[in-house]
């Protein structure tokens, strides 16, 4: 083909003189073409020379009218809110005054059209906004982003922001957290251990918190054992479950199952949780699974973390939940029934954690949003919930695996909605009602009415949904409810004549509480929920008890207190580790100081020589003497002792001052501070071997995927160190992990 012919051909296509291009072969070989056809290169190669044709001209993009209209609408909204940079006070005042329904007392006014708020989905995350203006702007911005993304030839990588490490997380997790880029597979348990930890969680932890949907989550454990890559939020959730399972195990059990101790397991799995959450960027990437993992993690920190820091961390959880709209019921937001129910479970667990951590931190006010309407979870088994369900979830008649959570939710809601009720537990006696600031008779009567209402609602719940024959969880729940109401009512009863001050009353309550704790420990040593009982231990109240003993040398109540201290310490040997914390050092010094004063008082005033308990001998050897210098032996100190604590005969003293043997070395370290809002030890009198339920084994319920009322029956206790027993329990889930353990 000649050059002229090529030019003519090109000209007929474009309609104007085109730029002469290199031939196809020269372009392909990336060599210089002389742009004559045939070119010299093609002639030498003896091949056909084909001229290139220019690419079709790109159509000129017209201005996007829709985009411009949306921008103009955003500008109008902003001008309406703040023209010339100043808000239109008159217009805002008019809008507020036009609201037909006034909000409840103490709540901020919300526009009628924005009563329920709105969820904003963006970049794989969800945020809640209750501002009409902002929700409208977010809608417009999202629509504009969709337009721009649709026009772009290269779509943006949606996962890039999701995988960006969250640098702010160091504010919560410290500098020892593994780097986000690290391989979390190194922290994963082995395939066989994964199934064992999952079963421990189902048996011991899940019945008490009910945050996850077992049938939906279980396939991920199968994938984890196969080494398949998991979504980052699922990975974080699994690590949080491993952590809670390790918390529920004793050191001996952990060593038998995993091959390493409990503390090593907690450090390993906690590091996995933190690394996964940081890799997700949990402070800016919000989804239900990530929040479940974070809540599980905070539960595992109870007792292992400073109580004030725990309250601060729980504030982060509340803000994330609020940003996701968890505080608004899913029915108001148009969410599917399954998601609505799971959000309810999560919110009430957060609510329980908030009031407990607030009270443990010494705060009476809550960080909860002033406007929340999330309904309480329904009485349904996990098998009754289906992710694809379209009908609203309804309560199931009869016993289910939710019974314990339903009771704790009622109690938590009562405490949160009854601020100011705590003082009446201390200011009920006739002698102290005149103290400035004491509640009036009318206020006490009002609170007693509220407590009667709580008692009635709890009784209705247990009568309707609780059946002792349905297993130990239901027995546990019945006694839990009875203990709460009994302790509250006892606190409201008039005190005896020996109670002189509210401090005396607190001392009496502390002694009775820890006496009940000892009984519950002794009767529940082989129960799957014993770990949970131990986590109820109130360190601060125990230190208060020791402080009172350092000022009260003798008396019937003092004798009971010393006996209780000696019975408590075998279950909490971590308290004897003086170098572990300043709190432990303070406790040890108070105990040594109190025993020294008691010895001297009984020797000089009563002629009795006491046998020194082994724990006192140990503490004397490790506590610096500067911490135990005391003036309690002086007459002025003894004169300050309440009369009730000095009135004791030689015979009574010799009977009451007996010392038991050495501490039982079989108990491992379980740390306190978990659940204790309305009462210092709400589980303190639970006896799961109560003769009211003869023949019922003391064990936890293993949740079943297809559980019915008849399925939730007592079975033999699971020994999690025995693979055969654990393998049998997996039959109900359709899994045979035996081969994975070999």
UniProtKB/Swiss-Prot annotation:
Metal-binding listed as a keyword: yes
Localization terms from the record: Nucleus
Biased composition (Basic and acidic residues): 105-116
GO-annotated biological processes: DNA-templated transcription
Region annotation (Disordered) ranges: 85-116
Alphabetical UniProt keywords: DNA-binding, Metal-binding, Nucleus, Zinc
Keyword match Membrane: no
Main location class: nucleus
InterPro entries referenced in this protein's UniProt entry, alphabetically: Sec_Metabolite_Reg (IPR050613), Transcription_factor_dom_fun (IPR007219), Zn2-C6_fun-type_DNA-bd_sf (IPR036864), Zn2Cys6_DnaBD (IPR001138)
Recorded phenotype for the gene knockout or disruption: Leads to increased expression of the pyriculol/pyriculariol biosynthesis cluster highly reducing polyketide synthase PKS19.
GO cellular component: nucleus
SMART domains on file: Fungal_trans (SM00906), GAL4 (SM00066)
SUPFAM superfamilies linked: Zn2/Cys6 DNA-binding domain
GO terms assigned for molecular function: DNA binding; DNA-binding transcription factor activity, RNA polymerase II-specific; zinc ion binding
One Pfam family here: Fungal_trans
DNA-binding region: 23-49
Free-text function comment from the UniProt entry: Transcriptional regulator; part of the gene cluster that mediates the biosynthesis of pyriculol and pyriculariol, two heptaketides that induce lesion formation upon application on rice leaves but are dispensable for pathogenicity. With TRF2, negatively regulates the expression of the gene cluster and the subsequent pyriculol and pyriculariol production.
Full protein name: Pyriculol/pyriculariol biosynthesis cluster transcription factor 1
Gene (name only): TRF1
């Amino acid at each position: 083909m000649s050059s002229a012919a090529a030019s003519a051909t090109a000209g007929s296509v474009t309609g104007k003189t085109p730029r002469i291009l290199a031939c196809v072969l020269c372009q392909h070989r990336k060599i210089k073409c002389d742009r004559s056809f045939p070119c010299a290169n093609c002639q030498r190669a003896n091949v056909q020379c084909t001229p290139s044709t220019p690419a079709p001209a790109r159509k000129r993009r017209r201005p996007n009218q829709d985009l411009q209209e949306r921008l103009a609408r955003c500008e109008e909204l902003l001008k309406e809110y703040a023209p010339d940079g100043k808000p239109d006070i008159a217009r805002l005042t008019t809008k507020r005054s036009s609201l037909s329904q006034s909000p409840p007392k103490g709540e901020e006014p919300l526009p009628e059209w924005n009563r329920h708020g709105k969820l904003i989905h963006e970049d794989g995350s969800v945020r809640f906004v209750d501002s009409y203006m902002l929700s409208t702007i977010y809608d417009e911005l999202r629509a504009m982003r969709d337009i721009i993304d649709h026009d772009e030839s290269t779509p943006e990588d949606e996962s890039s922001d999701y995988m960006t490490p969250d640098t702010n997380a160091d504010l919560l997790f410290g500098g020892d957290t593994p780097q986000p880029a690290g391989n979390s597979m190194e922290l994963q348990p082995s395939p066989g251990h994964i199934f064992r930890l999952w079963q421990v969680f189902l048996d011991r932890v899940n019945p008490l918190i009910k945050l996850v949907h077992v049938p939906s989550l279980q396939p991920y454990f199968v994938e984890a054992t196969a080494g398949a890559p998991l979504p980052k939020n699922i990975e974080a959730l699994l690590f949080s479950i491993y952590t809670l399972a390790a918390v529920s195990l004793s050191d001996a059990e952990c060593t038998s199952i995993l091959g390493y101790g409990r503390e090593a397991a907690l450090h390993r799995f906690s590091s996995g949780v933190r690394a996964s959450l940081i890799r997700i960027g949990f402070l800016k990437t919000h989804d239900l699974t990530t929040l479940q993992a974070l809540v599980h993690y905070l539960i595992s920190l109870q007792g292992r973390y400073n109580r004030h820091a725990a309250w601060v961390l729980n504030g982060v959880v509340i803000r994330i939940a609020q940003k996701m709209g968890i505080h608004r019921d899913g029915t108001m937001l148009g969410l599917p029934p399954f998601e609505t129910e799971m959000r309810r479970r999560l919110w009430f667990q957060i609510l329980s954690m908030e009031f407990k951590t607030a009270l443990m931190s010494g705060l009476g006010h809550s960080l909860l949003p002033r406007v929340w309407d999330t309904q309480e979870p329904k009485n349904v088994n996990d098998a009754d919930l289906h992710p694809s369900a379209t009908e609203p979830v309804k309560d199931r008649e009869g016993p289910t695996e939710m019974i314990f959570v339903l009771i704790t939710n009622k109690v938590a809601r009562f405490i949160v909605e009854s601020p100011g009720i705590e003082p009446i537990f201390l200011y009920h006696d006739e002698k102290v009602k005149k103290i400035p600031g004491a509640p009036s008779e009318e206020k006490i009567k009002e609170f007693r009415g509220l407590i009667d209402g709580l008692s009635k609602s709890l009784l209705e719940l247990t009568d309707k949904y609780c059946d002792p024959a349905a297993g130990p969880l239901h027995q546990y729940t019945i006694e839990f409810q009875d203990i709460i109401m009994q302790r509250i009512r006892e606190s409201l009863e008039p005190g005896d004549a020996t109670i002189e001050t509210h401090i005396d009353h607190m001392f009496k309550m502390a002694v009775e509480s820890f006496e009940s704790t000892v009984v519950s420990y002794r009767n529940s040593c082989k129960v799957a929920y014993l770990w949970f009982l131990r986590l109820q231990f109130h360190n601060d109240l125990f230190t208060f008890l020791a402080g009172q003993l350092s000022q009260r040398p003798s008396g019937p109540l003092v004798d009971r207190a010393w006996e209780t201290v000696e019975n408590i310490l075998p279950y909490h040997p971590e308290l004897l580790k003086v170098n572990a914390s300043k709190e432990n050092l303070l406790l040890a010094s108070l105990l040594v100081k109190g025993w020294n004063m008691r010895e001297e008082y009984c020797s000089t005033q009563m002629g009795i020589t006491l046998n020194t308990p082994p724990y006192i001998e140990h503490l004397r050897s490790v506590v610096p003497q500067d911490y135990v210098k005391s003036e309690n032996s002086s007459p002025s100190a003894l004169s300050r002792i309440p009369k009730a604590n000095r009135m004791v005969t030689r015979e009574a003293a010799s009977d009451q001052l007996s010392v038991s043997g050495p501490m039982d070395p079989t108990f491992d370290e379980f740390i306190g501070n978990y659940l204790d809002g309305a009462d210092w030890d709400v589980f303190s009198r639970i006896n799961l071997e109560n003769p009211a339920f003869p023949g019922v084994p003391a064990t936890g319920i293993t949740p079943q995927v297809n559980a019915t009322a008849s399925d939730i029956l007592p079975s033999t206790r699971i020994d999690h160190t025995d693979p055969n027993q654990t393998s049998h329990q997996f039959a109900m889930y359709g899994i045979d992990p035996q081969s994975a353990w070999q």
